[in-house]
């Protein structure tokens, strides 16, 4: 889908650092986790953050 905006990456990385145990390699579960861990007002931003987190976990590119 292209390069993600900086604000999506920033939110995703912060969530992974502070709430890593909530996230898995399943997009639908990550959507719920993002909704519970943040107060993101729009569904589109929530889904983009969840997709970014899922992609990071599946590719193994997230490091503590």
UniProtKB/Swiss-Prot annotation:
Domain of life: Archaea
Keyword match Cell membrane: no
Molecular-function GO terms, alphabetical: structural constituent of ribosome
Keyword list, A-Z: Ribonucleoprotein, Ribosomal protein
InterPro entries: Ribosomal_eS17, Ribosomal_eS17_CS, Ribosomal_eS17_sf
Cross-referenced SUPFAM superfamilies: Rps17e-like
The keyword Ubl conjugation is assigned to this record: no
Family (UniProt): Belongs to the eukaryotic ribosomal protein eS17 family.
Name of the protein this chain belongs to: Small ribosomal subunit protein eS17
